[in-house]
Amino acid sequence: RSKTSLLKLFYRQEKPNQGLISLDGKPLDQMSVKETAKQMAVITQFNQLQFDCTVEEIVMLGRTPHLSFLQKEKDRDFALVEDALVKVDLLEKRNRLYSSLSGGEKQRVLLARALAQEPTLLLLDEPTNHLDIKYQLDLLTIVKNLQINVLAVLHDIQLACRYSDYLYLMKEGEIVYQGTPKETITPESLQAVYGVQSKVTWTEDQQAMIHYL
C-alpha cells in the first residue's frame, strides 16, 4: 500500500485486510461515521468543490458532525468558525467566494473547516501539493503551531524534517524507518528507501540539509 492508502485506512475510505485500527482505544469499525468525524478531521490532496460557497459557509460545514438533522447553528458554532478563520488568517475574507481565492488560501479554508470540527486528530494527505513554496511554508507553520495531534503524508523530505516531531519512512507499503527526523533521515535510510547516495547535515535549528551525490 502507498502512504496515501495507509491514510485512507485511518479515515475509513478503505478497509484493512487484516489487523485493527483504534482511536483512543476504540476500534474504528465500531464507531459511527458521525462519531469518527467528531474526533478526526481530514484534508486530502483533491479538494475541488462542485459548488461555490462563501469562506464562512465552507468552514461552518466543519460543525456538521456536532449538529443533529436540521438543527440550526448556535452561537458557539459561529464562535468556533470565527476562531478557526483567525488561526488561518482569513477572517477578513469570510464573505468571499471560495472560487475567488488563491490555491494557498483555499487550502487554509479547508484547514479552518477541519479545525471547526474540534478534532483530536488531524489527517493531512499531501496538504501542500501543487502550492508555491510560500504557501507551503505558511500552511505547515499554521499546522505546526496547532495544539492538536497531526498525522501527515509529505513527500518533501526537508519539509517533513522541518515541521515534524516524528517520522515514518515507508517502502513498498511497509514502515522501514521511524524516529525523530535526525534519527530517521540518514544517508543509510535514504539509500535504502530511495536508492540515492547522499550527505545529510543539520542546521542549528534542526533543519535537514540533504546533498545528493
What positions do the PLM features span?
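Conserved ABC ATPase signature
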Residues: 97-101, 105
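Helix-to-loop junction immediately C-terminal to a conserved catalytic motif
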Residues: 11
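Catalytic Walker B motif of ABC-type/P-loop ATPase nucleotide-binding domains
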Residues: 122-126
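Conserved ABC transporter NBD signature motif
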Residues: 19-27, 36, 96
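ABC ATPase nucleotide-binding domains
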Residues: 187, 192-213
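A short, proline-enriched helix->beta-strand linker immediately N-terminal to the Walker B motif
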Residues: 116-120
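Conserved ABC ATPase "signature" region
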Residues: 60, 75-93
